[in-house]
């Protein structure tokens, strides 16, 4: 019985990882003309109201675009960019934008956060903890 549960868990894990990897590939295609993917990509499964963060390095004098994508089930993500001192550089909350373009004046690490919106609960629907989807953030540099 333990063997069956172990195999099932492994198969489901690979399935979810593959779905998020597929979303990342789609998001890379939408980064836009004039930008090249830097290889700094992060993807994860996220439930409503939860936050995902990762740190990326940005180099002096370069123009960058950070693009976010999510499963349709999760809706529009909130994208924030902060420095390591937690000073806010960008927040798309309320404007519906899925990308942020900027130029870096000095080489630095920035914290990129993706926050899945929390939807109003309806007694007829499953709880928000039951809704899980993939999110990804792609970093591109202007050519």
How does the language model describe each region?
Residues 1-24:
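Bacterial Sec-dependent N-terminal signal peptides
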Residues 2, 27-33, 57-64:
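Short charge-dense sequence patches
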Residues 20, 45-122, 141-143:
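Acidic, Ser/Thr/Pro-rich low-complexity intrinsically disordered segments
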Residues 20-35, 115-143:
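C-terminal edge strands of extracellular/lumenal beta-sandwich accessory domains
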Residues 33, 38, 87-91:
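Local beta-strand/beta-hairpin segments that build beta-sheet-rich folds
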């Amino acid at each position: 019985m333990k063997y069956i549960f172990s195999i099932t868990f492994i198969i489901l894990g690979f399935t979810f990882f593959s779905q998020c990897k597929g979303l990342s590939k789609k998001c890379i295609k939408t980064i836009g003309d004039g930008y090249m993917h830097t290889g700094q990509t992060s993807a994860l499964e996220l439930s409503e109201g939860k936050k995902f963060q990762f740190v990326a390095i940005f180099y002096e004098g370069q123009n960058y675009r950070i693009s976010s994508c999510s499963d349709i089930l999760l809706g529009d993500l909130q994208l924030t960019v902060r420095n390591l001192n937690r000073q806010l550089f960008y927040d798309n909350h309320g404007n519906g934008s899925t990308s942020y373009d900027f130029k870096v004046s000095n080489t630095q690490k920035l914290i990129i956060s993706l926050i899945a919106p929390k939807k109003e609960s309806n007694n007829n629907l499953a709880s928000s903890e039951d809704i899980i989807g993939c999110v990804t953030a792609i970093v591109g540099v202007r050519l």
